[in-house]
């Protein structure tokens, strides 16, 4: 409703979110590497690992990131949650909110959405 208040009749509302990957959501609850980078303050190589626990009933993915350096294991630990929106749910939410989905694309190059698309991009009008 808030978005629609700021729209006029010709405004396009574009929503860009990733498609949840079932292989990522249903993997074992063990640490997996996420990324590595050189810390700009210490110059140390920092490795980030994560554990994720997905609750399919709520659609919430509970994620813990562990930051490790050569000098300290679990130097920092961050916990956060992410709500997963599969395409069928996102379409229903947009339509139930009064939007008309003009086009759904799967990449920023405007390629049509496919079953294997990593993104779900909705171009909507009110």
Q: What does each model-identified segment do?
A:
Residues 1-12:
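A short glycine-rich, Lys/Arg-flanked "PGG" loop and its adjoining helix->strand segment in the class I
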Residues 3, 70-71, 108-110:
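Residue-level detector of functional hotspots within protein domains
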Residues 13-14, 101:
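A short hydrophobic/small-residue beta-strand
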Residues 14-91:
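SAM-dependent methyltransferase
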Residues 81-126:
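C-terminal lobe and adjacent flexible extensions of AdoMet/dcAdoMet transferase-like proteins
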């Amino acid at each position: 409703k808030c978005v629609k208040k700021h729209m006029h009749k010709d405004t396009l509302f574009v929503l860009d979110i990733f498609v949840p990957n079932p292989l990522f959501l249903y993997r074992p609850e063990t640490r997996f590497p996420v990324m590595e980078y050189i810390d700009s303050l210490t110059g140390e190589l920092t490795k980030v690992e994560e554990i994720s626990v997905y609750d399919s009933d709520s659609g919430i993915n509970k994620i813990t990131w562990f930051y490790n350096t050569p000098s300290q294991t679990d130097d920092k630990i961050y916990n956060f949650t992410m709500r997963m929106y599969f395409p069928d749910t996102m379409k229903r939410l947009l339509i139930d909110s009064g939007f008309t989905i003009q086009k759904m694309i799967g990449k920023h190059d405007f390629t049509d959405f496919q079953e294997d698309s990593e993104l779900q991009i909705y171009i909507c009008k009110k």
